[in-house]
From Swiss-Prot:
It comes from Homo sapiens. Component of the CENPA-CAD complex, composed of CENPI, CENPK, CENPL, CENPO, CENPP, CENPQ, CENPR and CENPS. The CENPA-CAD complex interacts with the CENPA-NAC complex, at least composed of CENPA, CENPC, CENPH, CENPM, CENPN, CENPT and CENPU. The gene is CENPO. It is found in: Nucleus; Chromosome, Centromere; Chromosome, Centromere, Kinetochore. Component of the CENPA-CAD (nucleosome distal) complex, a complex recruited to centromeres which is involved in assembly of kinetochore proteins, mitotic progression and chromosome segregation. May be involved in incorporation of newly synthesized CENPA into centromeres via its interaction with the CENPA-NAC complex. Modulates the kinetochore-bound levels of NDC80 complex. The modification Phosphoserine is found at S35. Residues 18-42, 83-109 form a coiled coil. It holds the Pfam family CENP-O. GO terms for cellular component: cytosol; inner kinetochore; Mis6-Sim4 complex; nuclear body; nucleoplasm; nucleus. InterPro entries: CENP-O. It comes from the Eukaryota. Belongs to the CENP-O/MCM21 family. GO terms for biological process: centromere complex assembly; chromosome segregation. This is Centromere protein O.
Length: 300
C-alpha cells in the first residue's frame, strides 16, 4: 500500500503552516505590546502637559498679583513722606521675594522641592533621591526680611551652605535653592552607593570601606573571587565635584604585585573605566554576575 503524501497540493507541509502561524501570533503579540506601551507614554505626556499648563497659569496669576500690588503702592507714593516711601519700597521688595519663593515651591514641587509658609517667611523641604530611590530630606527655614536670612536648617555641616547663601540668597533665591538641591542630591547619591557596596557586596571586600563624612573620598580593597588565589585590587575614588555622583579621579592598583601581566593590567584599567562611568553598586553587581569575567557591556 502506498503511503499518504504529507504535503498539501501547494507543496507546503503542515509543520510549515504551524510554524508560520506561530510567527504570526508572535508578531501580533509584539505589536499589541508596543501599542500598549505607546498608549502609556502618550498618557504620561498628556499628564505632564496638563501639569505644565497649570504651572504656567499659576505663574501668570502670581505675576498679575505682583503687578497689582505694585500699582497700588505707586498710587500712594505721591501722598506719603520720604521715609514712608522707603519703607513702602522695602515692603514691596519683601512681598515680591515671598511671592517668588511661593511660585518656585509650587512650580517645582515634583522635583523634590516643597515648603510651607511660616510666621517669619517660608520653610523649604528638600527631598533627595538617587536612581528613583527616595533618600533623606532636609529643611531650610528662611526669614523673609531685609536682608533675607536662614533661621534654622538641617543641612549637614560639610555641605557649603554658607558659601551658597553668600552667592545667591540675596540676589537669586531660585538659584540658591537649586544649587543647594544639587549638593544635597549628590551627597545622598554618593552615600547611597557606598551603603549599597557595604550591604550588598561585603563578600567581595577584603577590608573595611573607608570614606569621609562627605562621601567624596572612598577607598577599599576587593577580590573578584573571594575564595580564589587572585591578588586583591585596591581602589581609591575621589569626587572633586561635590555636585556629582560619579568620581572625577579613580586609581585602581593590584595589591602585592609590582609588575602586572598584560591580562591583569587590562583588567585593572577596565575597572578604572567602570568606576568612572557607572555607579559603584552597579559595577560590583556586574562583578557578581560575571564572576572573574568582567562585564564590559557596562563600559559602552
Amino acid at each position: 500500500m502506498e503511503q499518504a503524501n504529507p504535503l498539501r497540493p501547494d507543496g507546503e507541509s503542515k509543520g510549515g503552516v504551524l510554524a508560520h502561524l506561530e510567527r504570526l501570533e508572535t508578531q501580533v503579540s509584539r505589536s499589541r505590546k508596543q501599542s500598549e506601551e505607546l498608549q502609556s507614554v502618550q498618557a504620561q505626556e498628556g499628564a505632564l502637559g496638563t501639569k505644565i499648563h497649570k504651572l504656567r497659569r499659576l505663574r501668570d496669576e502670581l505675576r498679575a498679583v505682583v503687578r497689582h500690588r505694585r500699582a497700588s503702592v505707586k498710587a500712594c507714593i505721591a501722598n506719603v513722606e520720604p521715609n514712608q516711601t522707603v519703607e513702602i519700597n522695602e515692603q514691596e521688595a519683601l512681598e515680591e521675594k515671598l511671592e517668588n519663593v511661593k511660585a518656585i515651591l509650587q512650580a517645582y514641587h515634583f522635583t523634590g522641592l516643597s515648603g510651607k509658609l511660616t510666621s517669619r517667611g517660608v520653610c523649604v523641604c528638600i527631598s533627595t533621591a538617587f536612581e528613583g530611590n527616595l533618600l533623606d530630606s532636609y529643611f531650610v527655614d528662611l526669614v523673609i526680611q531685609k536682608p533675607l536670612r536662614i533661621h534654622h536648617h538641617s543641612v549637614p555641616v560639610f555641605i557649603p551652605l554658607e558659601e551658597i547663601a553668600a552667592k545667591y540668597l540675596q540676589t537669586n533665591i531660585q538659584h540658591f535653592l537649586f544649587s543647594l538641591c544639587e549638593y544635597l542630591n549628590a551627597y545622598s547619591g554618593r552615600k547611597y552607593q557606598a551603603d549599597r557596596l557595604q550591604s550588598d557586596f561585603a563578600a567581595l571586600l577584603t577590608g573595611p570601606l573607608q570614606r569621609n563624612p562627605l562621601c567624596n573620598l572612598l577607598s577599599f580593597t576587593y577580590k573578584l573571587d573571594p575564595g580564589g588565589q587572585s591578588f586583591p585590587f585596591c581602589a581609591r575614588l575621589l569626587y572633586k565635584d561635590l555636585t556629582a555622583t560619579l568620581p572625577t579621579d579613580v586609581t585602581v592598583t593590584c595589591q602585592g604585585v609590582e609588575v602586572l601581566s598584560t591580562s591583569w593590567e587590562e583588567q585593572r584599567a577596565s575597572h578604572e573605566t567602570l568606576f568612572c562611568t557607572k555607579p559603584l553598586h552597579q559595577v560590583f553587581a556586574s562583578f557578581t554576575r560575571k564572576g572573574e569575567k568582567l562585564d564590559m557591556s557596562l563600559v559602552s
